[in-house]
């Protein structure tokens, strides 16, 4: 994080956990907390939440929230993409979609606003749920994330 303020040890650990998961991974605060506890047993849940909030403020990680959803997910900064929230199993997956710049420019001009980013989240069924095999629902019920 060149040019960024020095972070407390615990925040660095949180950042490492999110970045180590790589692009395409989406972890909840609970997932990150569990991994942090493996490496630093004394770390508290509130510390993880404060660290996630600060890292998002700095742009070191990204937060994805689903309206009316129960959780937020965190991911490393990545090239522009969208997400699909599976309404059956609750999984969040990356999808290859970027809002067309022409559409964003037209919207900004029409509404007299400046658009900094387009964050797109689709709702529907992920590939396994759309195929109807139920594997994702069973896997997630057993507490296993991708």
What are these regions (language model features)?
Residues 1-15:
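Short alpha-helical segments that sit at the start of domains
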Residues 13-21, 35:
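Short amphipathic alpha-helical elements of helix-turn-helix/winged-helix folds
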Residues 28-41:
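DNA-recognition alpha helix
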Residues 48-58:
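Basic amphipathic alpha-helical segments that dock to polyanions
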Residues 60-63, 67-146:
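Non-DNA-binding regulatory cores of transcription-related proteins
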């Amino acid at each position: 994080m060149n040019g960024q303020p020095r972070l407390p040890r615990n925040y660095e650990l949180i950042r490492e956990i999110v970045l180590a998961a790589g692009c395409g991974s989406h972890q909840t605060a609970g997932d990150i907390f569990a991994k942090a506890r493996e490496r630093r047993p004394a770390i508290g849940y509130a510390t993880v939440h404060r660290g996630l909030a600060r890292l998002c403020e700095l742009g070191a990680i990204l937060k994805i929230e689903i309206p009316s959803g129960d959780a937020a997910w965190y991911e490393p900064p990545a090239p522009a993409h969208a997400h699909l929230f599976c309404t059956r199993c609750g999984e969040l997956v990356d999808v290859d979609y970027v809002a067309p710049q022409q559409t964003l420019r037209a919207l900004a001009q029409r509404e007299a606003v400046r658009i900094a980013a387009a964050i797109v989240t689709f709702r529907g069924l992920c590939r396994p749920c759309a195929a109807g095999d139920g594997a994702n629902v069973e896997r997630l019920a057993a507490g296993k994330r991708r």
